Amino acid sequence: MQQLNPSEISEIIKGRIDNLDVSSQARNEGTVVSVSDGIVRIHGLADVMYGEMIEFPGGVYGMALNLEQDSVGAVILGAYDTLAEGMSAKCTGRILEVPVGKELLGRVVDALGNPIDGKGPLGNTQTDAVEKVAPGVIWRKSVDQPVQTGYKSVDAMIPVGRGQRELIIGDRQIGKTAMAIDAIINQKDSGIFCVYVAVGQKRSTVANIVRKLEENGALANTIVVVASASESAALQFLAPYAGCTMGEFFRDRGEDALIVYDDLSKQAVAYRQISLLLRRPPGREAYPGDVFYLHSRLLERASRVSEEYVEKFTNGAVTGKTGSLTALPIIETQAGDVSAFVPTNVISITDGQIFLESAMFNSGIRPAVNAGVSVSRVGGAAQTKIIKKLSGGIRTALAQYRELAAFAQFASDLDEATRKQLEHGQRVTELMKQKQYAPMSIADMALSLYAAERGFLTDVEVSKIGSFEQALIAFFNRDHAELMAKINVKGDFNDEIDAGLKAGIEKFKATQTW
């Protein structure tokens, strides 16, 4: 019988141990304690980050929002009907990211960046974090370039600049979305990329908006992010941040982008729902204490960044170009109450507001912009020269007209000067009316404002102002196309352009009918 050598045995065992392939991995796992209303409580998870993605069986993901002593409260992203008590949940070590890039232009995606338009996968896109810190003070640049909305009343009186946050506020069904969509349509040839975020809207409404963008040739330049009314509160809360990340892709690479949040009232309601289900203490109107921070950290990401920021971000690939992300948040008020919690918050965060009024809308003044309450805190710095020069008296005329109209109801005999002011105000009010999906070019707008400013409307009947304006613009585009093209390209105002406009209008009034 062969004798076993102890040293041999130890060598064999040692060799086996050295060759053993140990492929075990450390996993941070916990157990689902409860599932209800899209909120999951998990016990046993350690080292979880706030906002970290948590993976559940069946490819379902959640996001950690409440980090308590003995449990984690997470919100489910999507359907949660497959989850049950006792299931395992594991940390991923990642925060939520969405696809970004030019491949998304012309597409409709959900809040997580998944395409929902039936046009196939997005292709080779990169991803970026949904929650990002806004650029610091040093990296910002002052706003001095315009974003043309195509609306006379906005571009003349409440100008919006690249990198500005301009709130559109008003009651339901008075043209807030229409104004934002027209602003997007007007960017199709301006080189500004657009992102439209629909929060809590009906799917039929969103489908109609997408169709209108396509009909007007603006969809190819736009990303549509949808978290419809039928989707979970978590997705409605995340959609604006996802859209903002998609817009920042362009800003950080020296491009200009415009983002519309339609609307932030519904995002605040969704966040309130999540917070109450997570048992956070309610505050005013049952909103949580951090609802201001919800909107401020989103809207602060809209900015104009300097050449140095773009150069540093792109590692020198893009030089000498500033980038901007302009935000048009929409807030819906109840019976014109702008002093409610969410409206006052957003008014204080933004750089001005366009206030739409129900009474004006119902009396046929559309867009129903109340020039007295609306303001742009960037102002003339972001206006083209010709519009800035010609729009000075428009706001004053409208403000004086409103004041005098109220006074004139009680006074029977008015002096000549007051009567002239009233008549001029009526004509300017009529001139500010504009059809939907018909944004105007700088030259068309300048022509209308010039006619009002220089008194060419005095002898035109109020009821015929609209047809006069249409005929005048058609006449100039036909007979003075060179002058109109010059205004559109440069936007300057000098004696030559002044003389050309004056002579053209005088000729039109002498030879044409309207």
From Swiss-Prot:
It comes from the Bacteria. It is found in: Cell inner membrane. The keyword Cell membrane applies. The keyword Iron does not apply. Its EC number is 7.1.2.2. Keywords: ATP synthesis, ATP-binding, Cell inner membrane, Cell membrane, CF(1), Hydrogen ion transport, Ion transport, Membrane, Nucleotide-binding, Translocase, Transport. It catalyses: ATP + H2O + 4 H(+)(in) = ADP + phosphate + 5 H(+)(out). It is a peripheral membrane protein. InterPro entries: ATP_synth_asu-like_sf, ATP_synth_asu_C, ATP_synth_asu_C_sf, ATP_synth_F1_a_nt-bd_dom, ATP_synth_F1_asu, ATPase_a/bsu_AS, ATPase_F1/V1/A1_a/bsu_N, ATPase_F1/V1/A1_a/bsu_N_sf. PROSITE patterns: ATPASE_ALPHA_BETA. Belongs to the ATPase alpha/beta chains family. This is ATP synthase subunit alpha. It comes from Pseudomonas putida (strain GB-1).
